[in-house]
Regions:
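An exposed, glycine/acidic-rich loop-and-rim segment of catalytic or binding clefts
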Residues: 1-344
Length: 344
């Protein structure tokens, strides 16, 4: 196991940005302190004999400083959408920054993804990790209360990428942290992901309106294009979903326990990724808005060249009383976990 840290660049403010590279098992993960973003994940393939980077991303700090597609970043205070960019809590209405039409997406104008996180690497018996910390002041992007976030990303000897999200607050506030990594198990720059085979441990999903805000209705997946209970190519029912997949699925089992969430298989490389989460939902996004994005080593990413599996609380939960509560505060700390296991 090994951890290295190097300077990734300098922001216009003069602050240094670091790039950490973790090695454990047969995986190698790189993460930058700007946006606590995953920049690279190298995974071997017995079938091809190659070790490929399976994450979309950028070669330079400038790519992450102007990252409009949220590539690889840690998202907060509230991942996904809040309808109308507002919510009411304890008799008071809070207005948020509108950055998705009439709605607030991924925390607002900058959220946590364009901020510089405090970072520290450490090693334990079974793995190597980086802990990122961030303080969000009262009123940040319109959200109430002071929040201290602590996110750990690491690799284990068992070829697992492990994730730990924590937040403490001095006042009640919606919280929903996730990572917005774009995967392509064939290797970044190797074309679209529509032939990847996906299975979701989800018997239902959240119905959404035309602007992707949940209606409040939880719909069984059986007999719909959203049925991934058995592994199938992403493209099989793709044409029946206008614009592609960008939907939250309700993960089977008890929220709060680490349980299977998703499995993805890519035939050319023979790679499989299994995802586990403690959260109630997972957003499956099929890269519908990747448009001529300049990526690594001269690659140009296009529509559907990567997919996201964003473990999270339900979108618009602050406005949907029937959804699991995403309000945390002094008497309820936020703490969620995820795990990505790789096989080849």
């Amino acid at each position: 196991m090994k951890i290295t840290r190097e300077k990734f660049g300098t922001l216009s403010s003069g602050k240094k940005v670091f790039l950490y590279t973790l090695k454990a098992g047969e995986l190698r993960l790189s993460i930058t302190s700007l946006g606590a973003a995953w920049t690279s994940l190298r995974v071997p393939s017995r079938k091809t004999g190659r070790v490929d980077d399976v994450l979309l991303g950028f070669d330079t700090l400038d790519g992450y400083a102007h990252n409009q597609a949220a590539v690889g970043v840690t998202v907060g205070r509230f991942a996904n959408r809040i309808g109308g960019a507002c919510f009411s809590m304890n008799g008071k209405q809070y207005s948020l920054f509108k950055n998705d039409g009439a709605h607030s997406l991924h925390g607002g104008r900058r959220g946590f993804s364009k901020l510089l996180w405090k970072s520290e690497a450490y090693e334990e018996k079974d793995g190597v990790f980086v802990r990122f910390e961030l303080n969000s002041p009262d009123g940040d992007e319109g959200y109430p209360g002071r929040l201290k976030a602590a996110v750990s990303y690491g690799l284990t000897k068992s070829n697992e990428l492990v994730v730990d999200y924590q937040a403490k607050l001095d006042a009640p506030c919606p919280v929903n942290l996730t990572n917005h990594a774009y995967f392509n198990l064939a290797g970044e720059g190797e074309g679209d992901i529509l032939s990847h085979e996906l299975m979701l441990h989800a018997s239902s999903f959240l119905e959404v309106d035309q602007t992707l805000i949940p209606t409040g209705k939880i719909v069984p997946v059986a007999g719909t294009p959203f049925d991934f209970k058995r592994r199938k190519p992403i493209k099989r029912d793709f044409d029946a979903v206008a614009g592609g997949y960008d939907h939250c699925f309700v993960v089977d089992g008890e929220a709060g326990t680490l349980r299977p969430c998703a499995e993805v298989f890519e035939e050319t490389s023979g790679r499989t990724m299994r995802v586990f989460t403690t959260q109630p939902g997972v957003q499956f996004y099929s890269g519908n808005h990747i448009i001529e994005l300049q990526g690594k080593a001269g690659s140009v990413y296009r529509i559907h060249d990567g997919f996201c599996l964003e473990t999270q609380h339900f979108p618009d939960a602050p406005n949907k009383a029937a959804f699991p509560s995403a309000i945390f505060g002094p008497e309820r700390d936020y703490h969620e976990k995820a795990l990505f296991a790789f096989m080849w």
